[in-house]
Amino acid sequence: MVILDRSYIFFVNKDRTGALCYKVQNKIAIVAGDPLCEPYLFPDILDEFKAYRKQFHWGIAFMGASDTLAKYARQEHWTTLQFGVERVLNPMTNDVLMERSGKRIIVQNKQLLNPDKGGITLGVYAPANGTDQSLQSELMAIYESWRHQRNRAAAAAQAFITVYNPFDFPNLMIYIYTRGPDGVANGLAALRRVGADEGYHIDPCIAAPGAPRGISDLLEYAAMALLNKMDVSYLSLGYEPLATLGDVSGLPLPIEKITRSLYRHTFQRLPIGGKKAYYDKFRPDPFLDSELYLVFPSGVPGLRHMLAMVHMANISIRKLVRSEAKSATQIESAAEER
């Protein structure tokens, strides 16, 4: 996901057998996912990166690490926290696509595509086959207007939302878009090729402000249909944060209890509960889902590490505090009314 964000940096080892994708926050190098190499090379590339980090006095942490890195981390007695899962659709067997489930989505799609009802049409744009700057500008306008509306409507922090230019890496992308009866584009889904799983990741999948209800569902369905025709069996929906921390290792029991409590308290105040419900209606394949971890090689994470992670997750501490204060005020008001 984060490779779409140009603010990330790649560290390549001397033998050019592996790489790390990272961003520095609060003098902590936050590595996105696992090292990009075979697991047996983890020690070598991490040792090289450690020597490089010493020049700048950076710490290190991992966000979105897989179970493969988590297993290595436990062997090294590092701290690991399972904070989420990556949800994945299988376009070759998906129950909604095969019309064995999701009747509401199927009926809604047919109504939207009916020329006498919704009048919606679908288009596919693959820049690798030829660039269309006019279309790109039109689709980028959808993304910008959607993001502007989302930010205005957000009463709390928009956690785990990546902000980037969807056209920064066009040769890796396939775009699916919708047009209304007036010919104006009103929906966009961007599919990024992910080589490790020989599949795709979808982000964003959005409707323009004022678009008919169900456009994003139609785009998700269309993405599965397209990948089915391409014989692709892997479509990542992205992170789904857990309401409570999963497996935790490397923390003393008292600190683990405090960490779990703080995480649960924070999660309840973030507007991300709808992710699970949205993903579930498309019937992700549980056999393709994978656990996601935060990993801290230094052991118990310090304040700098936690602040860096909060920033990386796009969590606004100011908005969290505001939400907490509002919640406390509402509780006090309710008590006074009694």
Regions found by a protein language model. Give the residues of each.
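Short, conserved phosphate-binding/catalytic loop or strand-edge motifs used
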Residues: 89-90
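A conserved beta-strand-loop-helix scaffold within acyl/acetyltransferase catalytic domains
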Residues: 1-30, 34, 58, 62-81, ...
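Catalytic domains of carbohydrate-active enzymes, especially glycoside hydrolases
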Residues: 52
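Short beta-alpha connecting loops at secondary-structure transitions
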Residues: 260-264
